[in-house]
Structures are given as C-alpha cells and as structure tokens.
Amino acid sequence: MKEILITNDDGFEATGLLALKETLSELDGVNVTIVAPSSEKSACAHSLTLTRPLRFIKLDDGFFKLDDATPSDCVYLALHALYNKKPDLVISGINHGANLGEDITYSGTCGAAMEGVLQGIRSIAFSQFYENNSLNELGFELAKEIVKFIVPKVLNDEISLNQREFLNVNIPATTSKNFKGYAVVPAGRRTYATHATLNRNPRGIEYYWLGNAALEYEKGEPSDISKVNEGFATITPIKLNMTSYESLESLKGKFDAK
C-alpha cells in the first residue's frame, strides 16, 4: 500500500483539495491522509509557525485540519505526529490558480512540496490555471485526469525525481476536449504590477491592501507560462539548491583572502 500525504494553501474546504482527494481515492493500492490549513494561506511561501503552538482538528478518518497553520506546517507536523514511517509521496494542491515562473517563490502550494523534499519525500505541486474568474465554470475535471496520469508514474518510479527537487505541474484553463498534451519546460519570467491600496477604517486608522497582478511574460524559449497559455499541462522540475553557479567563480575573485 502506497501512502500519500496531501495538503494545500487554499484551506481544508477548498474544491481543489476535495477534487484531489476524490481522484486519489480512485487509485488502486493507495492510502491518502489529508492535513490542510484551517483557512486560506495563499502566498505564504515556505513559512513555518515557530512562535505559537499548533493543533490538529480531526474532521474524518485520515482528514485533519491544522488550526491557523501554513501548508509547510501541515507537512512538517504530519510527518512528525501522524506517521511512523515516511509516506511515499507528498502532493500539494490542487491550487486555485496557476503557480508559474516567479509565482513559485510566493506559493504556499509549492512551499508544501518544498517541505516534503526537505524531509526526503518525493513531492508534486498541482495548480489549476484559470482566467477571468472562470474557475467555477471550468472545474477540475481535466486536473483530475492529469493527476491520475502523473501520480501512478511517480509512485511506480516511471518518473524519477532527483533528491532535493519536486515537480511543479500547472493545468491549463481548458477542457479535456481542447487539451493539447504535456510540456516539460523551464519556469518562465513575468513582469508584475505591484501596488498597495491605502484605506482608512471608521476610526481613521490607515491600513493597506497589497496587490500583485501579472502583466506579461518574457517571450522567447518555451516556458511554463507560454505553454499553459497554449493549452498544455506544464511539468517543471524545481530544485531547492538556489546557488547561482554561474556567478561563483567571478565572485571568488572579488573576495580572495589577502
């Protein structure tokens, strides 16, 4: 029996999480445990909660929410409190919205997959791209098909993952009929419009809402951004080693010991 731990950053009631649960339950020889945040934690990246205690709340057999926790908390604590041995796979998602290019650095969905990798477990992040508030209309039917295609291949070692890397999978905003297939591509680069909106509460105290909208992406070589917009499911292996090897040698010359 293969053990899979799943979490997300949209919260324990999110449609994408429940679609993932339903899909994995249909696979033979798989046991699924869910530990998800009690509320939405989008854009919390790979943060851990170190300044207050965390509490499991059991919702059903194998289904827990973690009170006011991050996705990385969910993975970290599940591995230490619920498992006697490590699960075979950590899956984060299905996220409500894509995680493309530099989105990965903000993403709580990808942060949970990173935590799985740091704990020595193969990990996948699944995200559903959508446009113009079409997620309710679009649904997760194509995403469920893609999960069913990829997950068994990872569990059966048809797809091998190197240590300290995870798969970032983005599902296009299209139907099964118009699905173009799979594209293994690098993460792209996007230009963002950042802004902060100033407001005042009834007592006159100022506060801000942060905003972050993607304007366009850099054209050129195929990337996760270009291909998901063309109707492909994109698969990008993400390494946790963030060293810039291109700059190592030139920097060494600037800091040679006297």
Protein language model annotation of sequence segments:
Residues 4, 18-81, 85-86:
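A cross-family phosphate/adenosyl-ligand binding-site feature
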Residues 7, 35-37, 92-95, 126-127, ...:
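Short beta-strand segments
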Residues 10, 40, 70-71, 95-98, ...:
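Short glycine-rich anion-binding loops that position phosphate/pyrophosphate groups of nucleotides
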Residues 10-18:
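Short acidic, Gly/Ser-rich segments with clustered Asp/Glu that frequently serve as metal-coordination loops
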Residues 78-84, 111-122:
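Alpha-helix C-terminal capping segments
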Residues 98-107:
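Glycine/threonine-rich flexible loop motifs
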Residues 117-139:
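Glycine-rich phosphate/pyrophosphate-binding loops
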Residues 138-258:
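Electrostatically charged, flexible surface regions
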